[in-house]
Swiss-Prot record:
Organism: Mesomycoplasma hyopneumoniae (strain 7448)
Subunit (UniProt): Homodimer. Heterotetramer of two MnmE and two MnmG subunits.
Residues passing through the membrane, by range: none
Lineage of the organism: Bacteria, Bacillati, Mycoplasmatota, Mycoplasmoidales, Metamycoplasmataceae
Protein name as it appears in the record: tRNA uridine 5-carboxymethylaminomethyl modification enzyme MnmG
Origin: domain of life: Bacteria
């Protein structure tokens, strides 16, 4: 779309505020629905930037990226095009927690997205800051910017990441700034507060970057990987031909001494930071204090681009002053002569209390206003992208007058993520872990396509033809399973000799053995891995599916939207407070709210039953 001089004369379907991983997914979801979109970002050359580690995926997170792809999102597709290394994690722990992680050329990733967005119709990209949301009668209808521009729209999605009233902290310095020296503003924060939203201060951090030419690689361990024939995207045909290595080293006793002697200079320990940091990604200062018994901690060198001129020092996140960072870095094997390209820092920012949100990621206070990404209290590119995609889908549904799309916990990690946020809230940056999912045997890396298919079709992000292709894949697997149950291996067969079989056995039984290579039985079947996983986990999957059905029944028990919780007898005071704040839509949601016990749920069910009986008696 060509840029207009008077944007206030145009009404858009949606405005997306912020061009990070959440914002980009939201934009693509809206464009797929043929809607007219404005993307407001600080710097279009830094779309979906990676201010922290240059990687996508990891335990649970890699499965989220697969789900994003299956749901019609783009993170997996662009990761495949920009990856410089890819590998499986947790292979030895079984298929339930198997995940993909890729090192990404962060510069290429942003360039690919900008290049692709420039081709899109119905999109206007503006470099500006948002100063005020336009709200009337609790409904958003547009916004104003710092450059005095006004945009009108039917819906707004805020995906500001860590940029709202953010401060970069290093030692005693606290500089108003976003990540990577970008602009920040308190205008939107103040506007949200005036609208009655509850904000909280959160904190994250990043390590120093080192010029690769200054590293002594003879003192570190090189990660040597085979070339894996794997991708994030189910549609991708791009395969990595060469793996670029990462490197492993460790902190030393000298490193720990320097940190301990200078703890008071760290922004974290000087009292300069009030925000709560991520539990599962602590700073090096935190690690030394909390795990003082450990003689050393792992440090990984990760290339930021294919050029490999800068290394991200994973494991050394810090808010120490620059002189202390330099002293500390030089005590690490391989970094004795290191030259720092960019010093580490902590960043503190405003985030929304996610209890303010519906499962659609629309706010409860303002209709048509959606929130996604780190503003909702999460950490990580994958968690952000997942929320952006869901917010984009549902903002589109809102504009088109359709029902929101809400992913259940038993169908995806995306469902677990959003359900946790809107029912439990978070007081620290939330990171997805496999342990957060009750049904992780069902929520696997290999079956994300079929789990997301119905949601993608309902969202309009995949066609009926694409949906039927996914269904046909699993029908083919089911037919092959039936065939294998009727085909047998006798003790005289070559296959029997290889696996020391003493009696006749079905091929299905044989393939379910953990020591059997499925390619020996299915050399030419394209979905052999998926079939093998289903065969080996059959009993466990059936059990978890049964448990999931019980949860689904609770999700179907609706709570009246206008229910007066103060009239529910014998509720605990904590349950009353949480119910009034969260206002769960179903008994299933209510049961997962922290502080709510089974007795509270029983009283709630009884009260709803009485209300229904009273209504019937009046008829």
């Amino acid at each position: 779309m060509s840029k207009k001089s008077k944007n206030s004369s145009i009404e858009f379907d949606a405005i997306v505020v912020g061009g990070g991983h959440a914002g980009i997914e939201a934009v693509y979801a809206l464009l797929k629905k043929k809607l007219k979109v404005v993307l407001i970002t600080l710097d279009k050359k830094k779309l979906a930037s990676m201010p922290c580690n240059p990687a996508i995926g990891g335990p649970a997170k890699g499965i989220i990226t697969r789900e994003i792809d299956a749901l019609g999102g783009v993170q997996g597709k662009f990761s495949d095009l920009a990856m410089i290394q890819i590998k499986y994690l947790n292979e030895s722990k079984g298929p339930a927690v198997l995940a993909i992680r890729a090192q990404i050329d962060k510069e290429k990733y942003s360039k690919l997205i900008l290049k692709d967005l420039k081709k899109q119709e119905n999109l206007l990209i503006i470099e500006d800051l948002v100063s005020e949301l336009l709200v009337e009668k609790n409904r958003v209808f547009g916004l104003k910017t710092a450059k005095k521009q006004v945009f009108f729209s039917k819906t707004v999605i805020i995906t500001t990441g860590t940029y709202m009233d953010s401060k970069v902290l290093r030692g005693s310095l606290a500089i108003p700034s976003g990540p990577d020296g970008q602009q920040t503003s308190n205008l939107l924060s103040n506007n949200l507060k005036r609208l009655g939203f509850e904000l909280q201060r959160l904190k994250t951090g990043t390590p120093p970057r080192i010029f690769t030419s200054s590293i002594d690689f003879s003192k570190v361990e090189k990660e040597v990987l085979p070339v894996y024939n794997i991708n994030f995207s189910f549609q991708s045909k791009h395969k990595l031909k060469k793996q670029i290595s990462c490197y492993l080293t460790y902190t030393t006793a000298k490193t720990h001494d320097i940190i301990n002697k200078n703890l008071g200079k760290s922004s974290m320990y000087s009292g300069l930071i009030s925000g709560v940091g991520p539990r599962y990604c602590p700073s090096i200062e935190d690690k030394i204090v909390r795990f003082s018994e450990k003689p050393r901690h792992q440090i990984f060198f990760e290339p930021e681009t294919k050029k490999q001129d800068i290394m991200y020092i994973n494991g050394l996140s810090t808010s120490m002053p620059e002189d202390v960072q330099l002293e500390m870095v030089k005590t690490i094997p391989g970094l004795e002569n290191a030259k720092i390209a960019k010093f580490g820092y902590a960043i503190e920012y405003d985030a929304l209390n996610p209890l303010e949100l519906k499962k659609s990621l629309e706010t409860k206070k303002v209709k048509g206003l959606f929130m996604a990404g780190q503003i909702n209290g999460t950490s990580g590119y994958e968690e952000a992208a997942a929320q952006g995609l869901v917010a984009g889908i549902n903002a589109g549904q809102f504009v088109l007058g359709k029902k929101p799309v809400e992913i259940l916990r038993n169908d995806g990690y995306i469902g677990v993520l959003i359900d946790d946020l809107v029912t439990k809230g978070t007081k620290e940056p939330y990171r997805m872990l496999t342990s957060r999912a009750e049904y992780r045997l069902i929520l696997r890396n290999d079956n994300a396509d079929i789990r997301m298919a119905k949601y993608a079709l309902k969202s309009g992000l995949i066609s009926k033809k694409e949906y039927l292709k996914i269904k046909a894949k699993y029908a083919k697997i089911d037919r092959k399973i039936l065939e294998l149950s009727k085909e047998f291996v006798s003790p005289k067969d070559e296959l029997a000799k290889k696996y020391n079989l003493e009696k006749r056995i079905s091929k299905l039984k044989l393939i379910s053995w953990p020591n059997v290579n499925f390619k020996d039985i299915l050399p030419d079947f394209e979905f052999g891995y998926e079939l093998t996983v289903m065969a080996r986990l059959k009993g466990y999957i059936q059990k978890q599916n049964s448990e999931a059905q019980k949860m689904i029944r609770l999700e179907k028990l609706l709570i009246p939207g206008d229910l007066n919780y103060e009239k529910v007898a014998n509720l605990s005071s904590e349950a009353l407070d949480k119910f009034q704040k969260v206002r769960p839509k179903t008994i299933g949601e209510a049961s997962r709210i922290s502080g709510v016990n089974p007795a509270d749920i029983q009283m709630l069910l009884f009260h709803i039953k009485v209300l229904k009986m009273q209504k019937v008696s009046k008829i």
